[in-house]
Amino acid sequence: MAKVPITLVMIIAIVSAAADLGCDYGHHRCYIDVTVENSPRQRHLLSDMDITLQCVRPMAKWFYEDKFQLRATLLRLERAQSGNSGNYGCLDSQNRWYNISLVVGHKEPVGNDIASFVKLEDAPALPESDLFFQPLNESRSLKLLQPLPKTVQRTAGGLFQLNCSPMDPDAKGVNISWLHNDTQILGGRGRIKLKRWSLTVGQLQPEDAGSYHCELCVEQDCQRSNPTQLEVISRKHTVPMLKPGYPRNTSIALGDNVSIECLLEDSALEPKITWLHKGNADNIDDLLQRLREQSQLPVDVTRLITRMDEPQVLRLGNVLMEDGGWYICIAENQVGRTVAASYVDLYSPSDTTTVRTTTTTTVASPIPTASTGEDNDDDVENPAAEASGGVGPPVFRKELKRLQHSLSGNTVNLACPVYGKANITWTKDKKPLNRELGVYVQKNWTLRFVEATSEDSGLYNCKVCNAWGCIQFDFSVQINDRTRSAPIIVVPQNQTVKVNGSLVMKCTVYSDLHPTVSWKRVVLKNASLDGLKSVEIQNLNFTVTNDSVVLTLRNVTFDQEGWYTCLASSGLGRSNSSVYLRVVSPLPPLEIYALLHAHPLGFTLAAITIVALFLLGSAFITFMLRRLRREKLLKLRIETVHQWTKKVIIYRPGGEEGSGCSSGDLQMPVIRIEKQRTTVSTTGTGGTDPAQGFNEYEFPLDSNWEIPRQQLSLGSILGEGAFGRVVMAEAEGLPRSPQLAETIVAVKMVKEEHTDTDMASLVREMEVMKMIGKHINIINLLGCCSQGGPLWVIVEYAPHGNLKDFLKQNRPGAPQRRSDSDGYLDDKPLISTQHLGEKELTKFAFQIARGMEYLASRRCIHRDLAARNVLVSDGYVMKIADFGLARDIQDTEYYRKNTNGRLPIKWMAPESLQEKKYDSQSDVWSYGVLLWEIMTYGDQPYPHILSAEELYSYLITGQRMEKPAKCSLNIYVVMRQCWHFESCARPTFAELVESFDGILQQASSNPNDAYLDLSMPMLETPPSSGDEDDGSDTETFRETSPLRYQYTYKFN
């Protein structure tokens, strides 16, 4: 026997009745066929027996206390205890009902349950074989109604539920706890919900996987369930998944309106929904299979039209007889298709109908070219709730129980709750309600009749209807006459009392006949349980009141600890129930209380002294704190002055920072600078000069890009413009760079004589570079310094300068020299002239096309693509610059460089010259001019054209620049395609990348040489664009009349 607390229960069986019960007490087995009509309906059995109940074949439904248990032919109770006592019933396939009442051993007092029948009084002897004991942990309160599943698979983002209901869910004092990987789960908020007996985990995540089990406890006695292993599967794209129960079959009266819903689970792929109508189909499964295989629609199938904003709902109005039949819903996405059908049955308004809620569903195999996903098997706690508030027939809120059993004199409630508003009609045995004894009470969805009698048994039907249809349900009500039984005993729980204290225990008895009630005590001698000689039964004195028998114990001693049993007997049988009394020692009095009683005056004076000292100390501390506060405020007024600073405010339209460009063109951030008053300390606690700590501008902090100013060491100036300059610097500890490694970067900043407009331009350029992102063929932003000093924008550094100068210095026959003061390289030759041939120039064009392809994919327009705005980095990697400086296009009708007020008209497309229209295709025109620059080693385009009007006249007549001398025909064909007058006829940058990829492969003797190694890591050291350069070699023209040529030429 396990070492657990046990309850001593003494029961003497009725051995004389064992012969006709089909029981073998020697082997502790009992076999009962509940279908035998002449067998008794109430059985009295011993505990610890294996009881088998049999119902007719095939499988029957078993019920315990009117609650469904399982579907089987046999119901087996292993080592049955008093907790298994109660009413059992089975319902066979012919709806025939059989029931039996079992009384097993002794049942612990719970509510008004019938206690065990015993023969304790008037027993001449107590045979040793009839004495046994019941452990506490055998209670039905700690047995699970159903075991937990061993393994469960769920999809990430789905729902996971477990239920640990005990066999007696109404038992009191039962506590439940849930554990995940042996760690207690604390729910109540977030994704984890704990109800009475259930655990629900929503929005599953990978860390939710593991072992789950529950633990039921009654006082100190606990029992743990078997573990359930949860596996969380990552969510992938799947075919459209229908919500359970959709679409629903329905019945509708002629002339009424009906809505059929094809509701789908949420999915990242937007499905396309199609509705078809098929009349009476002989084999609907064949039709669904053909549709699943994506074959052509049959001739006799009609395609229906639904609202574009609500394709999942098909609405039919004023239905006719030809509208009946099958309605097929096809939901399709890139993975596959799901096909489901529902049947619409039409009837005359005078007929009665029952709504059918079945669905025919089939899922197609995935489309061959799309990636397949896994089915979503997430649980849905209440699928019917999805239909609440919708258009359609009523839907029951919960599953209804057909069989209703009760005893005579009880109140019976029948309920048919539905969602929404509807009318309900009740009938009994297909007739209107009519009760001879008593009345029926109807309230909302409930039918109630009190003091039920056997005449109230019958078939009750509820019919609920609304404007779209009706549903109905049948209740089979069986009212049984109350069987007179042995007395029912209600006793208190186990008691605890202090030694020498008093205790009152009441034993309340309910009986059909006048009972005889008494209190007895069971005494164990020598703490032995091995025989009858160690047990003694003592009679106790008690008093009888109107409704109970009271046992009063005074001056309780330790010897009186033990079991006390209340016995009740009548002509119908005997019952008993026990309670355990525990006697404990009182707590010893504390010494402080003894001293208090001995010296009350001394304790009073000490308390008064402590309180007085506390009050005086509080007053002193309050006075000192107020004085220090006044002195601090006075000192602060002396040490502070007020100055005006400028706050930079950045508005990012089209999404959050870092989200890239929105749909359409790049939405430039709006920069506002507002003045505000700032308090500055004049003494500075750090010992620094206040003037050095004061900043003219206050910038918002962006922790993703902010770099400490101490990590930069500024060097020589690379270039200057009208309002800003670019400085070479050494940076330490940049993100994604080796520790303690120094990186050469370029730092952009405004000059001392700058204006607010100049500062806004630099901030706008920085924000645009943040939104565009990183690519190997564009100048990338590395970070910024915006706090504790002027604004520094840190970008990559390109040591070889811009492409235009690079081509000029490396053209055939050119002297190989460079300036020492430009901050780039010394006079060493950049690249051997014999290697800078057409193939290398084509590689340069290929890289620039890749960079422009990336900008176009980000919906960003360059507006000033030219060789002067392409920088040459380490390894002769081309990097596009100045894409962040097309800032004035949205503020004015054209782009004007702030340095010298000139326009790059020779690189502008015709639509940009005429209408100031800029898009990705106008950048393609500029790319063609850039390609011409590359193939001529940096020559100026259109050398003989001097004005915008002359250039537009030259282009509109169909004239284009001639093929360069050292340019192949394939590359010149690409130039001419970029110079197509109609923008829609020009190739895209993606197509240009493919063209140059093919040209490089054809030009290479080794196929592997045709590809550039562009998978190298991002350079951390390239520079900014050369927007602030003086542009001495840039052929641009001053804008003599900004609007004159806009109206001179018109498109046809």
UniProtKB/Swiss-Prot annotation:
<dbReference type="GO" id="GO:0035230">
    <property type="term" value="C:cytoneme"/>
</dbReference>
<feature type="glycosylation site" description="N-linked (GlcNAc...) asparagine">
    <location>
        <position position="500"/>
    </location>
</feature>
<dbReference type="InterPro" id="IPR013151">
    <property type="entry name" value="Immunoglobulin_dom"/>
</dbReference>
<dbReference type="GO" id="GO:0007424">
    <property type="term" value="P:open tracheal system development"/>
</dbReference>
<feature type="binding site">
    <location>
        <position position="748"/>
    </location>
    <ligand>
        <name>ATP</name>
    </ligand>
</feature>
<dbReference type="InterPro" id="IPR020635">
    <property type="entry name" value="Tyr_kinase_cat_dom"/>
</dbReference>
<dbReference type="GO" id="GO:0046847">
    <property type="term" value="P:filopodium assembly"/>
</dbReference>
<dbReference type="GO" id="GO:0007428">
    <property type="term" value="P:primary branching, open tracheal system"/>
</dbReference>
<dbReference type="GO" id="GO:0060438">
    <property type="term" value="P:trachea development"/>
</dbReference>
<dbReference type="GO" id="GO:0008347">
    <property type="term" value="P:glial cell migration"/>
</dbReference>
<dbReference type="GO" id="GO:0007426">
    <property type="term" value="P:tracheal outgrowth, open tracheal system"/>
</dbReference>
<dbReference type="InterPro" id="IPR007110">
    <property type="entry name" value="Ig-like_dom"/>
</dbReference>
<feature type="domain" description="Ig-like C2-type 2">
    <location>
        <begin position="124"/>
        <end position="230"/>
    </location>
</feature>
<dbReference type="GO" id="GO:0035149">
    <property type="term" value="P:lumen formation, open tracheal system"/>
</dbReference>
<feature type="glycosylation site" description="N-linked (GlcNAc...) asparagine">
    <location>
        <position position="444"/>
    </location>
</feature>
<dbReference type="InterPro" id="IPR001245">
    <property type="entry name" value="Ser-Thr/Tyr_kinase_cat_dom"/>
</dbReference>
<keyword id="KW-0677">Repeat</keyword>
<feature type="domain" description="Ig-like C2-type 1">
    <location>
        <begin position="23"/>
        <end position="117"/>
    </location>
</feature>
<feature type="glycosylation site" description="N-linked (GlcNAc...) asparagine">
    <location>
        <position position="257"/>
    </location>
</feature>
<dbReference type="GO" id="GO:0004714">
    <property type="term" value="F:transmembrane receptor protein tyrosine kinase activity"/>
</dbReference>
<keyword id="KW-0547">Nucleotide-binding</keyword>
<dbReference type="GO" id="GO:0007427">
    <property type="term" value="P:epithelial cell migration, open tracheal system"/>
</dbReference>
<protein>
    <recommendedName>
        <fullName>Fibroblast growth factor receptor homolog 2</fullName>
        <ecNumber>2.7.10.1</ecNumber>
    </recommendedName>
</protein>
<dbReference type="Pfam" id="PF00047">
    <property type="entry name" value="ig"/>
</dbReference>
<dbReference type="GO" id="GO:0008543">
    <property type="term" value="P:fibroblast growth factor receptor signaling pathway"/>
</dbReference>
<feature type="disulfide bond">
    <location>
        <begin position="30"/>
        <end position="90"/>
    </location>
</feature>
<dbReference type="GO" id="GO:0035153">
    <property type="term" value="P:epithelial cell type specification, open tracheal system"/>
</dbReference>
<dbReference type="GO" id="GO:0005524">
    <property type="term" value="F:ATP binding"/>
</dbReference>
<keyword id="KW-0675">Receptor</keyword>
<keyword id="KW-0597">Phosphoprotein</keyword>
<feature type="domain" description="Protein kinase">
    <location>
        <begin position="712"/>
        <end position="1000"/>
    </location>
</feature>
<feature type="glycosylation site" description="N-linked (GlcNAc...) asparagine">
    <location>
        <position position="249"/>
    </location>
</feature>
<feature type="signal peptide">
    <location>
        <begin position="1"/>
        <end position="19"/>
    </location>
</feature>
<dbReference type="GO" id="GO:0043235">
    <property type="term" value="C:receptor complex"/>
</dbReference>
<dbReference type="InterPro" id="IPR011009">
    <property type="entry name" value="Kinase-like_dom_sf"/>
</dbReference>
<dbReference type="InterPro" id="IPR036179">
    <property type="entry name" value="Ig-like_dom_sf"/>
</dbReference>
<feature type="compositionally biased region" description="Low complexity">
    <location>
        <begin position="358"/>
        <end position="372"/>
    </location>
</feature>
<dbReference type="GO" id="GO:0042690">
    <property type="term" value="P:negative regulation of crystal cell differentiation"/>
</dbReference>
<feature type="glycosylation site" description="N-linked (GlcNAc...) asparagine">
    <location>
        <position position="137"/>
    </location>
</feature>
<dbReference type="GO" id="GO:0007430">
    <property type="term" value="P:terminal branching, open tracheal system"/>
</dbReference>
<feature type="topological domain" description="Extracellular">
    <location>
        <begin position="20"/>
        <end position="600"/>
    </location>
</feature>
<comment type="similarity">
    <text>Belongs to the protein kinase superfamily. Tyr protein kinase family. Fibroblast growth factor receptor subfamily.</text>
</comment>
